[in-house]
């Protein structure tokens, strides 16, 4: 029944999704304003969702242009559906323009198809179809739309300062059948304090180093600019050998007497950096072989001592595992250095319930002082957990099982979704076990089958939660 309902809307679903995907809704602080708190792209995507909601007869409520909601249903309790329309930067290497959606016979290709614009449109159409069916709602629905999920969650922080907290809810921003627990997440900077000037002449001076754009992405590109005082050819040959030995792509050029070294890695979501290749850490590994100036030497030595080849916090003394939630993970997402201001490592750390976060950070902060580094802690989100046997979770899982015959149990993840904003919040779809996960990677796509099947599952689940009860 539900799949047949969705079939009647397939063309509309694709057209509305294409319109949303065409908006480059990447956070841009340089263009932020009161009207566009995280830049014009995210604001435009939020307005787009309001426009299609108004077209279809729904009411909306805007919260300072950084978040808002689409309203449906009636009743005392509120089901929250928490989505986001911002996306991570596209990066390089796409086979098509990431913001000009390509629709093939069986897929849609663009940045945001999986994370989170495709699932957002799927959830929206589930609500729209039920409204078109004139169902007798027993709950209200707030489809809450954020614009800063990929960075600092300013959107939901602002939203929940003044707006009603849903009784229960889900975020269509992960996988089926249901994610009932999420690791704690924090970002922090390891900031280098500048050392005294060199007493002895070094052979090489690191002028600048840059790798990574987002704390929650493994950097796939790194660039170092090095002043080489002698033996330029030897350095280039050593670098080429290093690339070959480590199965890496990279390049070396000379720009106005400065040696420019680049390394290409593999970008993946920061919740599991072990499956990516961190270009920045590899390039620092090479630089450690050079007789660099004091500051640079301390910077690259720190990377090798604590960060390189340590995706589970081993070198930082933070290795920890639980059977329910898995391991601590550490993603070094941003690395910068210049010879005027010294360096910085931007880290995204995720941890399971039971990890003594404050104790571990205090110990680490004290330990690294001797190497000229300090910790600047950002936002800390504690682990989030809902019992998988809760009736709410079971209703979601039942809708999934009815349509897929897949009896996989709900599980926990290292990723963080808006679900953790709610006491009784879980992540629910929209990826299936056979979906290719290209979130935060080039050539991100969603299959039409996945898009329509997710819509159908959301349709049944929302009906079960908001109409039958």
UniProtKB/Swiss-Prot annotation:
Zn(2+) 1 binds at residues 115, 150, 440. This is Putative dipeptidase SAB1611c. The keyword NADP does not apply. NCBIfam families: dipeptidaselike, PRK07318.1. Zn(2+) 2 binds at residues 84, 115, 173. Transmembrane segments: none annotated. Binds 2 Zn(2+) ions per subunit. GO terms for molecular function: acetylornithine deacetylase activity; dipeptidase activity; metallopeptidase activity; zinc ion binding. The active site is at 86, 149 (proton acceptor). Keywords: Dipeptidase, Hydrolase, Metal-binding, Metalloprotease, Protease, Zinc. Belongs to the peptidase M20A family. It comes from Staphylococcus aureus (strain bovine RF122 / ET3-1). GO terms for biological process: L-arginine biosynthetic process; proteolysis. Its EC number is 3.4.13.-. InterPro entries: Bact_exopeptidase_dim_dom (IPR036264), M20A_pepV-rel (IPR010964), Peptidase_M20 (IPR002933), Peptidase_M20A (IPR050072). Its cofactor is Zn(2+).
């Amino acid at each position: 029944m539900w799949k047949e309902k969705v079939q009647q809307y397939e063309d509309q679903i694709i057209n509305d999704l294409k319109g949303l995907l065409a908006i480059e809704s990447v956070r841009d602080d340089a263009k932020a304003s009161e009207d566009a708190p995280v830049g014009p792209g995210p604001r435009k995507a939020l307005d787009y969702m309001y426009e299609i909601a108004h077209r279809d007869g729904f009411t909306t409520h805007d919260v300072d242009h950084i978040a808002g909601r689409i309203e449906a249903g009636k009743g005392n309790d509120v089901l929250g559906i928490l989505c986001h329309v911002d996306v991570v930067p596209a990066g390089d290497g796409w086979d098509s323009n990431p913001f000009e959606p390509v629709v093939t016979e069986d897929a849609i290709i663009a940045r945001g198809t999986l994370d989170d614009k495709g699932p957002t449109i799927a959830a929206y159409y589930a609500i729209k179809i039920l409204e078109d069916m004139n169902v007798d709602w027993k709950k209200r629905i707030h489809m809450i739309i954020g614009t800063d999920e990929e960075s600092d969650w300013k959107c939901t922080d602002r939203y929940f300062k003044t707006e009603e907290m849903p009784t229960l809810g889900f975020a269509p921003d992960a996988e089926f059948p249901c994610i009932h627990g999420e690791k704690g997440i924090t970002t922090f900077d390891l900031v280098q304090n500048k050392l005294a000037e060199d007493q002895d002449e070094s052979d090489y001076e690191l002028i600048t180093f840059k790798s990574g754009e987002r704390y929650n992405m493994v950097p796939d590109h790194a660039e170092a600019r090095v002043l080489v005082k002698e033996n330029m050819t030897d350095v280039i040959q050593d670098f080429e050998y290093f690339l070959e030995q480590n199965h890496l792509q990279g390049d070396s050029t000379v720009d106005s007497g400065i040696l420019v070294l680049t390394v290409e890695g593999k970008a993946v979501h920061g919740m599991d950096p072990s499956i990516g290749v961190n270009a920045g850490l590899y390039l620092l590994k090479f630089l450690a072989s050079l007789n660099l100036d004091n500051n640079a030497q301390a910077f690259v030595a720190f990377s090798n001592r604590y960060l390189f080849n340590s995706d589970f916090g081993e070198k930082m003394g933070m290795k920890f595992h639980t059977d329910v939630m898995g391991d601590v993970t550490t993603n070094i997402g941003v690395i910068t250095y210049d010879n005027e201001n010294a360096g910085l490592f931007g880290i995204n750390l995720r941890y399971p319930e039971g990890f003594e976060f404050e104790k571990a950070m205090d110990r680490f902060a004290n330990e690294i002082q001797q190497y000229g580094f300090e910790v600047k802690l950002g936002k800390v989100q504690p682990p989030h957990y809902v019992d998988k046997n809760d009736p709410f979770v079971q209703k979601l899982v039942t809708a999934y099982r009815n349509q897929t015959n897949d009896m996989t149990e709900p599980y926990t993840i290292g990723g963080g979704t808006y679900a953790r904003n709610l006491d009784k919040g879980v992540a629910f779809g929209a990826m299936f076990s056979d979906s290719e996960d290209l979130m935060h990677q080039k050539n991100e796509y969603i299959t039409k089958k996945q898009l329509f099947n997710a819509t159908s599952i959301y349709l049944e689940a929302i009906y079960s939660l908001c109409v039958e009860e």
